[in-house]
């Protein structure tokens, strides 16, 4: 009980600006209600006779009947027919809708998108948070590294075939220009259509704005400088989003301080972007209750408290608790998650919301 009291006292002091450590920079944000959402497919646990009705007891907004696509929040995975290179075996891939944005058919995509939306969530009066989760490629050409590098290579090959006598720099520059022009078109028009057909909902793309902190090439809390500059140039996207949805999943391999730094940097960047926009979209951080690199292990009570605390003191408007279908695909997993909710996650959530609000 003493630990809970101390945690609440410290949190309230930070929220009210009475105390802030040397590494803390309180973000200037208008006073808002702090909300926590449940975005976990726990409906899958119903088949085992386990229900998560207690979620709302902890001041967590929970879809009616535990629906995954519900009245409070709905996430749409890879909706429509975005251009993509879908991986097959032996390094091969299947080309979907042109493979890359500059080769794609936007009309077909938008038609498939609205069909998908109407099928998965037909209620056009939806007034919750609508999340578009598209992670095949990023609209900034440079940011397509790792598994996404295939999109850069594919784009470069297209230009090289057209202009075999151009030098490497000219080819890459043209590939980048074409890719980014049409990537913007696909992402922007998709968002506009979602807003047009579900006008009461708050829409945003999962993960944006990106920060790329605590990564191999930028192993510090602050966001990559180039990424910040690129975020500044993405007002075309953020001006259309009602909510910003940075991802703050933490890894077990990081030290406790590094985990805090990861959350701090990403929330601060999203708040910075929000503060630059006239409509000041709310910032809801996507948060996972397990470690990203050790998905069978729940976050410790300390990590839950500290990550929630960082989201609050750096100006976030709330948290979206996310979970994978693989987290709840057996009786034992459902039982463990429910116990974790009742004993660790839930009590911390209610303490944080009451302290802030």
UniProtKB/Swiss-Prot annotation:
Transmembrane segments: none annotated. It is found in: Secreted. GO terms for molecular function: hyalurononglucosaminidase activity. Disulfide bonds join 45-334, 211-223. Residues 1-26 form the signal peptide. Its main location: secreted. It catalyses: Random hydrolysis of (1->4)-linkages between N-acetyl-beta-D-glucosamine and D-glucuronate residues in hyaluronate. Glycans are attached at residues 105, 125, 153, 351. It comes from the Eukaryota. InterPro entries: Aldolase_TIM, Glycoside_hydrolase_SF, Hyaluronidase, Venom_Hyaluronidase. Belongs to the glycosyl hydrolase 56 family. Hydrolyzes high molecular weight hyaluronic acid to produce small oligosaccharides. This is Hyaluronidase. It comes from Vespa magnifica (Hornet).
């Amino acid at each position: 009980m003493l630990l809970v009291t101390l945690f609440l006292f410290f949190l309230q002091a930070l929220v009210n600006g009475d105390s802030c450590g040397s590494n803390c920079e309180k973000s200037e944000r208008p006073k808002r209600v702090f909300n926590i959402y449940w975005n976990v497919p726990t409906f899958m646990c119903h088949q085992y006779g386990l229900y998560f009705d207690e979620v709302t007891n902890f001041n967590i907004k929970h879809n009616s009947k535990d629906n995954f696509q519900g009245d409070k929040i709905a996430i749409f995975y890879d909706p429509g027919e975005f251009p993509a290179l879908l991986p097959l075996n032996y390094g091969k891939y299947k080309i979907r809708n042109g493979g890359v944005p500059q080769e794609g058919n936007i009309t077909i995509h938008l038609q498939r998108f609205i069909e998908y939306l109407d099928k998965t969530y037909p209620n056009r009066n939806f007034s919750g948070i609508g999340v578009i989760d598209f992670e095949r490629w990023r609209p900034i050409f440079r940011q397509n590294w790792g598994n996404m590098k295939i999109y850069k290579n594919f784009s470069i090959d297209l230009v090289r075939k057209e202009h075999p006598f151009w030098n490497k720099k000219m080819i890459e520059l043209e590939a980048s220009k074409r890719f980014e022009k049409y990537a913007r078109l696909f992402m922007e028009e998709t968002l506009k259509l979602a807003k047009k057909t579900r006008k009461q909902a708050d829409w945003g793309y999962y993960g944006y704005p990106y920060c790329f902190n605590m990564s191999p090439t930028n192993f510090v809390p602050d966001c990559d400088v180039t990424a910040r500059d690129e975020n500044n140039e993405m007002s075309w996207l953020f001006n259309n989003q009602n909510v910003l949805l940075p991802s703050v999943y933490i890894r077990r391999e990081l030290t406790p301080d590094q985990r805090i730094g990861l959350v701090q940097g990403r929330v601060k960047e999203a708040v910075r972007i929000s503060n630059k926009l006239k409509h000041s979209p709310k910032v809801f951080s996507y948060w996972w209750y397990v470690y990203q690199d050790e998905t069978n292990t729940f976050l410790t009570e300390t990590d839950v408290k500290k990550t929630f605390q960082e989201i609050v003191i750096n100006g976030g408007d709330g948290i979206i608790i996310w979970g994978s279908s693989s987290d709840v695909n057996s009786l034992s997993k459902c039982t463990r998650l429910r116990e974790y909710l009742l004993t660790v996650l839930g009590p911390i959530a209610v303490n944080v919301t009451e302290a802030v609000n």
